[in-house]
Amino acid sequence: MTNTRKTHPLIKIMNHSFIDLPTPSNISTWWNFGSLLGLCLVIQILTGLFLAMHYTSDTLTAFSSVTHICRDVNYGWLIRYMHANGASVFFICLFLHVGRGMYYGSYTYFETWNIGVILLFAVMATAFMGYVLPWGQMSFWGATVITNLLSAIPYIGTTLVEWIWGGFSVDKATLTRFFAFHFVLPFIIAALVMVHLLFLHETGSNNPSGLISDSDKIPFHPYYTIKDILGVLLLILILMTLILFSPDLLGDPDNYTPANPLSTPPHIKPEWYFLFAYAILRSIPNKLGGVLALVFSILILMLFPLLHLSKQRSMMFRPLSQCMFWILVADLFTLTWIGGQPVEYPYIIIGQLASILYFAIILLILPTISLIENKLLKW
């Protein structure tokens, strides 16, 4: 009798993806973030679904409906804060997942990598639209400022912004369409995740050494299922600790004030996970230049496969590149800090220097160091 797991048309796909999948025997904890991102997506879709049952996307009642969820719905406060802080944990996992790919050269699977970058854009768009929905001060002004950036596009900019707004300012039409897009995008993301995995399973996983590991593969289950469960438990522990002890730690107090078009908050800033890109945007005095830098700061990830000039795939045996990679990480922390500061001296110049360094490391310094390391191999 044949095993149903290996013959059933549907279960067979699951089997090849999560059970009998040949996996390198030496992948470290840095490879856990893929499954953790899957978990985050499931948490966000489920909590979001229950929030959508009680939320109203109308400028007059949106803020009140969120308050109603927190006060009157059974465990509504828990669902709301799981969704809000779940987004933060989602982005932490995303940044670590991308950083792992950069460090260990996973970007050489360029189909998988490019789908991943598209996923990053989709998640960022979803998170931005989600931030607008509670209709607090930072929701309203964040939406106004960020959508207004599109007016920098020559010729069609102003028309495009008014088309997105559905009027001449951020109002009811904007909120309704943002809710519609915020609801549908996670399902598109889930479909893209399937494509991401499809491309990954065509090539198999990378491993810390960056070497071909075909001769030393082990089945995914039970080895990595157990390993992933540990990651899942730790993620849930961190998320629940954040929710139950300090749910507003990563939020903005201004968002507890209902949106008021007549009163601008002293410092308009996005959620913490966009601050690095926001700092790059602000570091350029020209509007169009800032927008291009903002888009390119993420789009630059797509150039990684082209900028890989080293003879070795991973940075595991490349100490000079490692050093530069960690300087890049420190630079991103600096940009995140600057993005949350007011636009005044010395923050302006620090932001500009950090932005220049960010692009210089990726486009110039890392490829140059790779070539130097290639020369050192011959010594």
Curated annotation (Swiss-Prot):
It holds the Pfam family Cytochrom_B_C. It is a multi-pass membrane protein. The chain crosses the membrane at residues 33-53, 77-98, 113-133, 178-198, 226-246, 288-308, 320-340, 347-367. Belongs to the cytochrome b family. Its main location: mitochondrion. GO terms for molecular function: metal ion binding; ubiquinol-cytochrome-c reductase activity. Its cofactor is heme b. Heme b b562 binds at residues 83, 182. Coiled coil: none annotated. InterPro entries: Cyt_b/b6_C, Cyt_b/b6_C_sf, Cyt_b/b6_N, Cytb/b6-like_sf, Cytochrome_b, Cytochrome_b_C_euk/bac, Cytochrome_b_N_euk/bac, Di-haem_cyt_TM. This is Cytochrome b. PROSITE patterns: CYTB_CTER, CYTB_NTER. It comes from the Eukaryota. A ubiquinone binds at residue 201. Gene3D superfamilies: Cytochrome Bc1 Complex, Chain C. Component of the ubiquinol-cytochrome c reductase complex (complex III or cytochrome b-c1 complex) that is part of the mitochondrial respiratory chain. The b-c1 complex mediates electron transfer from ubiquinol to cytochrome c. Contributes to the generation of a proton gradient across the mitochondrial membrane that is then used for ATP synthesis. It comes from Marmota vancouverensis (Vancouver Island marmot). Heme b b566 binds at residues 97, 196. GO terms for biological process: mitochondrial electron transport, ubiquinol to cytochrome c.
